[in-house]
Amino acid sequence: MKNVRKIFTAIIEYDPEKKQYVGMVPDVPGVHTVGSSLEEVRRNLKEVLELVLEEAGDEINLQEFVALEMIEVET
């Protein structure tokens, strides 16, 4: 079976209270992690994503649509 390269959207935020980065891949349930740097959280996300996809095989339910939007409000 030939491997297929897929690209997923990751959301990474910085948590100033815990002084760490928090990352998630909204298309794939269960893919979230933390890291002390952007490089570490990216590496961790890739590792978790690969593990979840390998474990689930064809049974995973990927989201069909994920969007990032900028919403403007007055405060």
UniProtKB/Swiss-Prot annotation:
<comment type="similarity">
    <text>Belongs to the UPF0150 family.</text>
</comment>
<dbReference type="InterPro" id="IPR035069">
    <property type="entry name" value="TTHA1013/TTHA0281-like"/>
</dbReference>
<dbReference type="InterPro" id="IPR049389">
    <property type="entry name" value="TTHA0281-like"/>
</dbReference>
<dbReference type="Pfam" id="PF21748">
    <property type="entry name" value="UPF0150"/>
</dbReference>
<dbReference type="InterPro" id="IPR051404">
    <property type="entry name" value="TA_system_antitoxin"/>
</dbReference>
<dbReference type="GO" id="GO:0006355">
    <property type="term" value="P:regulation of DNA-templated transcription"/>
</dbReference>
<protein>
    <recommendedName>
        <fullName>UPF0150 protein TM_1313</fullName>
    </recommendedName>
</protein>
